[in-house]
């Protein structure tokens, strides 16, 4: 099997934070959003990019390479025994996998045909018909909640309403959902923002967990290595920040 091709910038093996069990996470390159705090800025462009080495001495690397569905599946299926023993599987991430619809659909379909559990990590910003087409192929939706509607476009680069409409749609169709919430101190962690997360977790059928993802500055170094002139900076989350977030969201089973 060869199948269609797309630009992949990483394949992470033995991942344990992107769905249940031991997983392989396939990162597709290209995203329509521009989150200020993005920790993988090399995922934004839809084309391969040159990135300086971390030590500044080694040759630069090219981030992203064209791979077929068959090539990706050859890597994914190597660890099927681990998936079967741990309840794991394949997670498609990005970038934004819904912006790579044909490749994502073909890859998920291939995994399902081999009995591999599937998850997709997504912002939910995509035409409804794409999401509807993927519903039979996705066992778990890892759905980003980045900011409340009032400040969403300012921080992320797109309106929140289509994302919230799509979330309500998959919930109405019986999807299993994990809400993933990147929180940046002083940026998107206001009382209003935390109340928005709590409401979604309580009112959206199918939400099995809320994952809080505290900001970390990984993206700062990557932006520098990509040669970008300016980039976002924010403080690390303190333990007090994290405790406040957990208390406000009131999710006993969050990570």
Describe each region flagged by the PLM:
Residues 1-20, 185-255:
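Auxiliary Fe-S-binding modules of radical SAM enzymes
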Residues 1-68, 78-86:
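N-terminal [4Fe-4S]-dependent radical SAM core
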Residues 58-61, 69-80, 228, 239-248:
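Short alpha-helical interface patches
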Residues 58-62, 154-159, 226-234:
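Short glycine-enriched, charge-decorated loop/helix-capping segments at active-site entrances
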Residues 60-67, 95-98, 233:
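Short coil/turn segments at secondary-structure boundaries
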Residues 73-219, 224:
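Conserved AdoMet/S-adenosylmethionine-binding subsite of the radical SAM
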